[in-house]
């Protein structure tokens, strides 16, 4: 899975770290099928410890931490759902999440790979469309600013709250 992501440090480290906790969480159900409940949190903590010991620079640690935090997030391959995730996590984090999901699936589902990958390929296609259209994915990209809201009589934190609500509405494509 590590080799299946683009050669970016944070992606390669994320793929290496994301399943570290599985051996500590492995259980078997009645049919003898293995499960790894809670491995995400344990993997993230183990990654934190390793990154601290290896003295990773803060920006790299932050990027890896962000990827690990949303690694198990699932979103529907629908335009509004992906747009909302792009607004919530940032466009780069969503792109990296798509890379890591596709690589993770490729590593564990050899039979029926195309069917397992189909939702992620569709999500990637939608992501690419949103990027090429210049979709608004952050407060700074809104056509209205805090200054505009202040001119309309909004004050302080209320301005940030209104901008956040507007971004949510734009991302939901309402």
Residue locations for each model-derived region?
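Divalent metal-dependent catalytic cores for phosphoryl transfer on phosphate-bearing substrates
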Residues: 1-116
